[in-house]
Regions:
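Histidine/acidic-residue-rich, glycine-tolerant segments that coordinate divalent metal ions
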Residues: 1-95, 99-104
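Metal-dependent amide/peptide-bond hydrolase catalytic core
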Residues: 66-174
């Protein structure tokens, strides 16, 4: 379609309509609401580095599993201590991957982190705080390398226009 110059013959729409399935909404019902309805979100993969060693000699290594654990605990303070109570924010560590053996201290650990916010300034603060905390914990743990941050799945705030929402609601109620 793009090769057929569709972009040139189509007019820019006045509004975009989308839908999202919510577990909290009963089947067969349609929910509408003006204003902010779905938070902005981003995910980040963080890789922290250690120094591998045998589990019987942990003093010879830098344990990235312990490092990842301290990062998870410290990240929990972002929302509770750095974001104003009137704001909405979430920081979730959804996965940690590290190592393959019970008696080997591995070289690295990976954390998969997701954030949600309704305010772009809060979202930016979450990003900065995650990086600050990860970097500081890496220094405290004697990590031999800088952490790696890979951002993905970035979604903007869904903020429904009042007039468009009213028009859609009227159509569903008809």
């Amino acid at each position: 379609m793009l090769e057929a110059n569709l972009k040139e013959v189509m007019l820019r729409p006045d509004v975009y309509l989308g839908q999202h399935v919510l577990a909290s909404l009963r089947g067969g019902y349609v929910g509408t609401r003006p204003g902010p309805v779905l938070s902005s979100a981003f995910s980040v993969k963080v890789v922290v580095h250690g120094k591998g060693s045998h589990g019987s000699m942990p003093e010879l290594g830098v344990d990235p599993v312990v490092l990842a654990s301290t990062i998870v605990m410290r990240l929990q303070t972002i929302v509770s201590r750095e974001v104003a109570a009137k704001e909405t924010a979430v920081v979730t560590v959804g996965a940690i991957h590290a190592g393959t053996k019970s008696n080997i201290i591995t070289d690295s650990a990976e954390l998969l982190i997701n954030t949600r916010a309704y305010n772009s300034a809060v979202s930016e603060h979450l990003k900065e705080a995650i990086e600050r905390i990860v970097r500081a914990e890496c220094v405290a743990a004697r990590s031999p390398q800088e952490p790696e941050f890979t951002y993905y799945d970035r979604y903007p705030l869904t903020d429904n226009d009042g007039d468009a929402t009213s028009t859609v609601r009227e159509a569903f109620d008809a």
